[in-house]
Amino acid sequence: MASEERITALKEFLAKDPNDSFSSYALALEYNGLGQTEKAIATLRDLVQRDPKYVAAYQQLGQLYAKMNKTREAKRYYRRGIEAAEETNDMHAKREMEEALEEIEDEW
């Protein structure tokens, strides 16, 4: 299935269940894969507002902002993701985001 078809399918899932965090996250990844970074970011930001414990979304936001050299935003989302990871006991994601945050801070 091509990315555009997956996007259509994910939008259909979300029309039926707007609170489906997994489908929102998958939609953001599809947008990013097509180079539609702003749509990916908007989708992820909506997701973390709706589901503040969806750790992977913070990690993805941090990565996207870091690639765009938007260091302040990347740090903010990594820090929020670390907090969410602690709350959900996702120590693997916590470590990954701590390492990413350290890399950003070392660059500055």
Where is each model-derived feature located?
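Alpha-helical linker/edge segments of TPR/alpha-solenoid repeat scaffolds
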Residues: 3, 71-76, 100-108
